[in-house]
From Swiss-Prot:
PANTHER family: 2-KETO-4-PENTENOATE HYDRATASE, ACID HYDRATASE. GO terms for molecular function: 2-oxopent-4-enoate hydratase activity; manganese ion binding. Pathway: Aromatic compound metabolism; 3-phenylpropanoate degradation. The keyword Lyase applies. It comes from the Bacteria. It comes from Pseudomonas putida (Arthrobacter siderocapsulatus). Its EC number is 4.2.1.80. This is 2-keto-4-pentenoate hydratase 1. The keyword Lyase applies. InterPro entries: Fumarylacetoacetase-like_C, Fumarylacetoacetase_C_sf, Hydratase-Decarb/MhpD_sf, Keto_pentenoate-hydratase. Its cofactor is a divalent metal cation. GO terms for biological process: 3-phenylpropionate catabolic process.
Length: 265
């Protein structure tokens, strides 16, 4: 399905307006097709350009759809990615306004912080996994959607910045030496009750697989990852709905604990 530039710009503006007003809108796939990744990424790029023109600062990327069960649910066989901006970041144990993200859910992930630029050519696993290029830290990602009741398909989440809302970053980053990112167990509680668990193996088999996929994808687009970029590699367990006033704490073996509280309104 070929989508006109005028339609892409209108849909991008619809997304921005929905996010600003905190109101759900009909799924974008109704206009572009459920699996039209090309149009969906074009809409995402339009809104990223709008954000940069407004003075927002790009600090990294997120990888989504890294769990095979989620891929099967949405009928896709690949991850997607979105952009992280500085004004989306919160620190460990900070309070997040509940209304900052529409229909919020939360995921526990592994974040990688680049200490050196990645090659502009197609990066390899050794390029990405080089211990001198990476540090690892503990994030929570708060995702959301403008589609009613999380009724989304591939095109909907891609266009909507891969459903990215906010992220909480616990630090400082630590070297990869001695870390078993694949086998690391994750546990997340909501108000002291266990609500999500998993391991690094649930993120494309290994969190570094997600990072390599992202690095190669961005290199092909002529926008390689740079020193200082943050990469959220994908959920290690099921995402969990957030209610006003909730407190979440999550721990990953070897990386430690990170927490966040949501305001009452």
């Amino acid at each position: 399905m070929t989508i006109s530039q005028e339609t892409l710009e209108r849909l991008a503006a619809d997304l921005r307006r929905a996010e600003q007003q905190g109101e759900a809108i009909p799924p974008l796939r109704d206009a572009i097709g459920a699996e039209n990744g090309e149009a969906a990424y074009a809409i995402q790029r339009l809104n990223v350009a709008h954000a940069l023109a407004a003075g927002r600062r790009l600090v990294g990327r997120k990888v989504g759809l890294t769990n095979p069960k989620v891929q099967a649910q949405l009928g896709v066989d690949q991850p997607d990615f979105g952009c992280l901006f500085a004004d989306m970041a919160y620190g460990d144990n900070e309070t997040v306004p509940f209304d900052r993200v529409l229909q919020p859910k939360i995921e526990r992930e592994i974040a990688l912080v680049l200490e050196r630029d990645l090659p502009a050519r197609t990066p390899t696993w050794p390029n990405v996994a080089n211990r001198h290029r990476l540090g690892a830290c503990r994030p929570l990602e708060i995702v959301g959607t403008v589609s009613p009741t999380w009724n989304i398909r591939f095109a909907d989440t891609v266009a909507d910045n891969a459903s990215s809302g906010l992220f909480v970053l616990g630090g400082p980053a630590r070297r990869l030496d001695g870390l078993d990112l694949r086998g690391a167990a994750m546990r997340m509680t909501r108000n002291d009750e266990l609500v999500s668990s998993g391991s690094g193996a649930e993120c494309l088999g290994h969190p570094l697989n997600a990072a390599v996929w992202l690095a190669r994808t961005l290199a092909r687009l002529g926008d390689p990852l740079k020193a200082g970029d943050i990469v959220l590699t994908g959920a290690l367990g099921p995402m969990v709905a957030v209610n006003a006033g909730d407190r979440f704490d999550a721990e990953i073996d070897g990386l430690g604990r990170v927490g966040v509280t949501f305001s009452q309104s």
